[in-house]
Amino acid sequence: MIPRIPITDISPAVYFGGEFVAVKAIAGETIAVSATIIIEGHETLTAEVCLYNSKNKMVDCKPLVQNWPGTDRYEGSFTVPAQGDFYFVVKASSTSQYRTVTGESEKYPVHADRDRALIGSWYEFFPRSEGAVRNADGTVTSGTFATATKRLPGVAAMGFDVLYLPPVHPIGISHRKGKNNTLEAQADDCGVPWAIGNADGGHDAINPVLGTMKDFEDFVKAAGKNGLEIAMDLALQTSPDHPWVKSNPEWFNKRADGTIAYAENPPKKYQDIYPINFDDDYEGIRNEVLRIIRLWVSKGVKIFRVDNPHTKPVHFWQDVMNIMREESPEVIFLAEAFTRPAMMHSLGKAGFHQSYTYFTWRTSKWELTEYAKEVAYTTSAFFRPNFWVNTPDINPFHLQSGNPAMFALRAVLASTLTPSWGMYAGYELYEHRAFKEGGEEYMDSEKYEIKVRDWDGATKKGLTLAPFIAQLNAIRKAHPALQRLRNITFHDTDSDAIIAYSKREGKDLILVVVNLDPSYAQGTTVHWNMQALGIDHHDFEVKDLLDGATMTWNPHTFVSLNPARPVGKVAHIVQVKL
């Protein structure tokens, strides 16, 4: 029922599955709130938003103000003080010489996760490739957890926080794929890690080629000593050789002839993978998945990258997420869902902490601006983006020229537009060869074979973007403004080749200007929105965090960026002296 003073259109509010579900936040994050509040006649109103913890104790209460008189739209914010469950209420009152009347909204839940749910730099590598050796006869000896451990300092030196591993479980033998996705594997082909399971075990086992369970535990500990969290792949599918196929045949789809149906995503066919049927033994599958998650959590894994969650029932994920949040609130789930917006958003509402996004395919100034505003404001209550520049599945068209400046500018965009971004190994070496023209698959894809890379040789020759990546991640760590999602403002430029935006958190104000043209120098005037920046004087001093240069800028700043110069000059990332 409408309260005595009607309070409507409250934002943020996330309605899903017949109830309000929690707005996403982290400890210390400030959440903007707005509501339409009306009263009959000409009475004046006061309004506030109050935040309560799970014990119904008020922990914050701030006024709401009608910034645009006549709109009846009241705006303000609250700050979440700690991890955990909270709820907020919008209150209004009006006092006249005759009476005092009040109104109060219903309760809107808020959940604050640990910081990594919002903030992080992610790196992906295949352990079997790290430390792999190409022998004199052309064969390749696989890397192991022991050899991959030697790569951890290099990943940490680039400033990454999370190391994501593709599946490390036993790989199926039946219908194993060969190099470049050929249907017939050779004797030395290692198989696709996502075809999980053979006689050595399934999702709860380690591929013996990589080592033992103890080797994995040692690897996780070594990563921690290097400041890295391990993100494990949770791929709910199997090879034809997985133990589940015999123990629980009801977990799979069967054709009319009684054979199990393999996975298909027309026109692609995955003869080496069986999808799961969640409808015939839902509780059994859920309990088994929870057992698997709990096992790896006990081994030190606190982050899971979930493979293709959009091909599984949304209510299944909501069930799993709710249970895990109660048991282990430190555990984070990233949705690898490159699919329709409604499904991606539903997965976020169901409980996924983060999601892959469309950033990989947003390249123009207009596309980047509109998409960044969407994820920062329209969907941020339930959908946290993680901007990946590439993945083993996606070699974007714009990278296929191999132009180092394009790799640099895309890294700048991904690492400064949102607080979480990711990069797949080889990006820093400018790997770009496509399997076929017009496609986004890598030539000699690491999904199907071991890739031997010469990290030291590339460093000695200066053929690596790693120092620049390290610089970007260091800037991110040093500046709170780049660790928030809901604080981005775009500023007009006179050229579509240059994009400009700002982010502010307290006294930390960062301006970013990027040349989107990797081949030619571009110059333009940037028209800074001084009110949005919170600067009340004409000229302001800035320091470029990429090259240390200090400059004096003004509301209409001419900027020239030449990608032919060192990679730092595909962009300005400047801190404003306040």
Locate predicted features.
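Aromatic- and acidic-residue-enriched carbohydrate-binding clefts of CAZyme catalytic domains
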Residues: I119-E124, S129-G143, I171-D218, K246-E283, ...
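Substrate-binding cleft/loops of secretory-pathway carbohydrate-active enzymes
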Residues: P240-E250, V314-W317, E326, F338-W366, ...
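Short, solvent-exposed turn/loop segments enriched in Gly/Ser/Thr/Pro and often Arg
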Residues: Y164-I173, L234-P243, D307-P313, E336-R340, ...
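Catalytic-core region of carbohydrate-active enzymes that cleave or remodel glycosidic bonds
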Residues: I323-I332, E336, P341, T363-E437
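Active-site neighborhood of glycoside hydrolase catalytic domains
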Residues: N277-M344
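Carbohydrate-interacting/catalytic domains
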Residues: M1-R128, A132, A136-D161, P170, ...
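Substrate-binding cleft of carbohydrate-active enzyme catalytic domains
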Residues: L152-H169, A195-A261, N277, D281-V306
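Hydrophobic faces of well-ordered beta-strands that scaffold small-molecule active sites
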Residues: S121-Y123, L163-L165, I230-M232, F304, ...
